[in-house]
Amino acid sequence: MSTNFIYPNAHLIAGVDEVGRGPLVGAVVTAAVILAPNNPIEGLADSKKLSEKKRLLLAEEIKAKALCWSLGRAEPEEIDRLNILHATMLAMQRAVAGLNIQPDFVLVDGNRIPTLPMPAQAVIKGDSLVAEISAASILAKVARDQEMAELDVQYPEYGFAKHKGYPTKLHFEKLEQFGATPFHRKSFAPVKKILGL
């Protein structure tokens, strides 16, 4: 991890990250992780920079070694009702609330922080700078990819396992061909257009 980031002076620090703000389908998934200082995990990095195999291995190690971890989510209906930013903040609040040890301080990837009952700080590129945020990004990514694999079994014609719900050429073609599933985000412009909303 880079040394430019100065950790807050706190005993229990949770890292929080989200996956799935951009896709047209499925929940936005967040994770909160408090790492054990005496049980380091080698190879933590931004989940987007790791191979799927490495992510899966690290996710198991994080779950085994972290002091505690929790996932949060906001469903497509919530995203449509609140908008993606507010739904993401809600999912982050849920991840932090789900921790069975309350952190003293929360570090959140990006430039915005949700309202939390403890001090928090946003960290730009936090998934590359802060071990706790990297761990959260890995857990959230693995969980969301698993959900997309399950959705792919339910709706094999859409190719969800390939594009993970992101707005790719293939996804647009399948939307045109088959219409939207109940899991598509109806407030997102390409889906809205297909549904004629």
Swiss-Prot record:
<dbReference type="GO" id="GO:0003723">
    <property type="term" value="F:RNA binding"/>
</dbReference>
<protein>
    <recommendedName>
        <fullName>Ribonuclease HII</fullName>
        <ecNumber>3.1.26.4</ecNumber>
    </recommendedName>
</protein>
<dbReference type="GO" id="GO:0032299">
    <property type="term" value="C:ribonuclease H2 complex"/>
</dbReference>
<comment type="function">
    <text>Endonuclease that specifically degrades the RNA of RNA-DNA hybrids.</text>
</comment>
<dbReference type="Pfam" id="PF01351">
    <property type="entry name" value="RNase_HII"/>
</dbReference>
<dbReference type="InterPro" id="IPR001352">
    <property type="entry name" value="RNase_HII/HIII"/>
</dbReference>
<feature type="domain" description="RNase H type-2">
    <location>
        <begin position="11"/>
        <end position="197"/>
    </location>
</feature>
<dbReference type="GO" id="GO:0043137">
    <property type="term" value="P:DNA replication, removal of RNA primer"/>
</dbReference>
<keyword id="KW-0479">Metal-binding</keyword>
<feature type="binding site">
    <location>
        <position position="18"/>
    </location>
    <ligand>
        <name>a divalent metal cation</name>
    </ligand>
</feature>
<dbReference type="GO" id="GO:0030145">
    <property type="term" value="F:manganese ion binding"/>
</dbReference>
<dbReference type="InterPro" id="IPR012337">
    <property type="entry name" value="RNaseH-like_sf"/>
</dbReference>
<dbReference type="GO" id="GO:0006298">
    <property type="term" value="P:mismatch repair"/>
</dbReference>
<dbReference type="GO" id="GO:0004523">
    <property type="term" value="F:RNA-DNA hybrid ribonuclease activity"/>
</dbReference>
<keyword id="KW-0464">Manganese</keyword>
<dbReference type="InterPro" id="IPR036397">
    <property type="entry name" value="RNaseH_sf"/>
</dbReference>
<keyword id="KW-0963">Cytoplasm</keyword>
<keyword id="KW-0540">Nuclease</keyword>
<keyword id="KW-0255">Endonuclease</keyword>
<keyword id="KW-0378">Hydrolase</keyword>
<dbReference type="InterPro" id="IPR022898">
    <property type="entry name" value="RNase_HII"/>
</dbReference>
<dbReference type="GO" id="GO:0005737">
    <property type="term" value="C:cytoplasm"/>
</dbReference>
<dbReference type="InterPro" id="IPR024567">
    <property type="entry name" value="RNase_HII/HIII_dom"/>
</dbReference>
<feature type="binding site">
    <location>
        <position position="17"/>
    </location>
    <ligand>
        <name>a divalent metal cation</name>
    </ligand>
</feature>
<feature type="binding site">
    <location>
        <position position="109"/>
    </location>
    <ligand>
        <name>a divalent metal cation</name>
    </ligand>
</feature>
<comment type="similarity">
    <text>Belongs to the RNase HII family.</text>
</comment>
